[in-house]
A protein has these predicted regions:
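Catalytic NTP-binding/metal-coordinating core of nucleotidyl cyclase/transferase enzymes
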Residues: 9, 31-112, 117
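A broad, low-specificity signal for short, low-complexity segments enriched in glycine/proline
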Residues: 10-11, 27-30, 58-60, 88, ...
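Acidic/proline-rich low-complexity IDRs
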Residues: 9, 20-22, 70, 122, ...
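Catalytic beta-strand-to-alpha-helix segment of the class III nucleotidyl cyclase homology domain
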Residues: 79, 98-199
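Intrinsically disordered or compositionally simple regulatory linkers and C-terminal tails
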Residues: 2-42, 199
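Alpha-helical structural motif
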Residues: 13-16, 74, 163
Length: 199
């Protein structure tokens, strides 16, 4: 079982890191925010969550300063991936992130590129992905689709891009292969969810 990451203790009781990534106050923002937002609009998006597996152990072994240098290199890699595959980086919590894409194939290609690039840093990353209707306002995206994506990421293993059946259904004609990972219970989400490893 994974030891608890520092990021899971940064939020209010009952709110874990995956949920926190979906909260608007965890995205980069100016010190002063307007007291109102524009009306949200419904959009269809692919949400991609990723985080470092075993980051607490790495931090403890390396020390704060060396670990921060690794994180700087890590975030440079993921931002390059977002730029290459047209992803939008929405929020960050600890070493985890949330991004959206117009199409699942872009998100899978981005995740694969990040996995390959972080090998030089000795990092193990896991990804979770879902596609569906979201509510978008300003630079914030929310809704059940986002939370499902977060829960899928929590079920992923190191080095895995774990996706929902909805993602797989969008890619029936693509060259991307999928390995059936069976049905899963996703915390707080009704029903059983069929998940697949994209490879």
């Amino acid at each position: 079982m994974q030891s608890q990451d520092p990021k899971t203790t940064l939020f209010a009781p009952g709110v874990d890191a995956e949920e926190a990534l979906a909260l608007p106050h965890n995205r980069p923002q100016a010190v002063e925010q307007p007291m109102h937002r524009r009306e949200p609009k419904q959009v269809r998006a692919t949400v991609l969550f990723g985080d470092i597996v075993g980051s607490t152990e790495r931090l403890a072994a390396m020390g704060d300063h060396k670990w921060m240098k690794v994180l700087d290199a890590y975030y440079a890699i993921i931002h390059k991936g977002f730029g290459t595959f047209q992803g939008i980086h929405l929020s960050t919590a600890g070493d985890g992130f949330l991004a959206t894409f117009d199409h699942p194939v872009q998100a899978i290609q981005c995740a694969a590129a990040i996995l390959e690039s972080v090998k030089e840093l000795g990092l193990r990353i896991r990804f979770g992905m879902h596609v569906g209707e979201c509510l978008s306002v300003d630079e914030f995206v929310g809704g059940l689709t986002v939370h499902i994506g977060a829960r899928i990421a929590a079920a992923a293993d190191a080095g895995e891009v774990l996706v929902s059946d909805a993602v797989k259904s969008h890619l029936v004609d693509s060259a991307i292969r999928f390995v059936d990972r069976g049905n899963h219970d996703l915390k707080g989400v009704p029903g059983r969810w069929r998940l697949f490893t994209a490879c």
